[in-house]
């Protein structure tokens, strides 16, 4: 069994034969229900891009857990320089295997910086763990090539999609992404953290209709696959 827990904003904890964090923005996250020290035994940390609300506490958690950080090559180097001794795996789109976990880094339409300097490119991740396939879109707008993700690596058991608009897809665009991705289940994320990304997940659910099962998770709640 694989469990996918929503930690608020775009942060998720995936637990199966390996324990994986994605975009662990906990400190300073008004939605957060966990702290960095709660993840002392995590195996991998995936970072979609360098913005502070996604890179978050990745370095700190890697320090206390010994987890490997998987990120765009430039971002991996940035983290390794900032947090000496942390092990990173730098990618630049494409598939790889890290400690028995199949990971595909896929494009995302978004910027990536530390607030001052551009660092690498934004991405999403497809993770295959214990027979289940999880897609975390990162921050992105909808794009036609999303249909390749399910064609190449599907079926996708759960897609974690931003719906807040302003910086990413809104509910209408995210519903279109569901058509392209054809996931069995979709979990909305990256909304209602701050006023600029206010969105109604129930509106998203209506737009998706019967194309996929929409599960709206509150921070701290989890989905079993």
From Swiss-Prot:
It comes from the Archaea. The keyword Heme does not apply. One of its GO terms (molecular function) is hydrolase activity. Keywords: Hydrolase. The keyword Nucleotidyltransferase does not apply. Belongs to the UPF0173 family. NCBIfam families: PRK00685.1 (NF001911). This is UPF0173 metal-dependent hydrolase PYRAB05000. It comes from Pyrococcus abyssi (strain GE5 / Orsay).
